Amino acid sequence: METLLAILAGMILMSSLVKVGLLPMKVRLVVAVCYAAFMGWVTSHMTELSHEVFVQLATDRSIMLDLAVCVILEAVVMMTYCFCSPKQKVWGVLLEYEPVLLAIPALCYFQAQLLYGLPGVDYAWVAWMSAGLVLFLMLGGPLLLRWLLRERHLLLELLFIINLLIVVLCVAITGYS
């Protein structure tokens, strides 16, 4: 189960990376700074919880079902954006600036894994190093994707495929738990 959750969180972050790559540079900068600041801020709250709390949350079936519903709804919104964006109808414009909200819990998941995986390391150092890494990846990753996939419709197809895999993974997680 832990492996499936890690893969799901990674896919959600990849989806947010592709989605941020479709935004204008100013918006990308704001999103990257917000994600990085969140990574630095959330560490003090996460250190108050023990690792067993995270394990209990991951093994509780009702929480996993609620999480699956939220993830599937977010993926459907992203897939709707993929269909509406090329036509630039009202929905495409509205969904363009809709942030990937599930990137925040995915970042929390990886921050918790990092904090509990590095015992004896200063939490503040881990927090701000991970914030710097998130800032670098959220600014550099979309530029790399735009350079590799040059055309907007290829980025939209990649976003659609990633979100389709997220939906399949959510179905697998709910069936597994």
Locate predicted features.
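Membrane-proximal helix-loop-helix units in multi-pass membrane proteins
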Residues: V77-G140
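C-terminal transmembrane helix-loop-helix hairpin of multi-pass membrane proteins
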Residues: A124-M129, G141-S177
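Hydrophobic alpha-helical transmembrane segments in multi-pass integral membrane proteins
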Residues: V42-T47, A106-L114, L165-S177
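A generic, lipid-embedded transmembrane alpha helix
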Residues: R28-H51, P105
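Membrane-interface helix termini and inter-helical loops of multi-pass transporters
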Residues: M46-D60, L114-A124, T174-S177
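N-terminal signal-anchor/start-transfer transmembrane helix
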Residues: T3-L22
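Alpha-helical transmembrane-segment detector that highlights a single hydrophobic TM helix
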Residues: L49-C84
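Membrane-interface helix-boundary motifs at transmembrane edges
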Residues: V18-V31, F83-L94, L145-L155
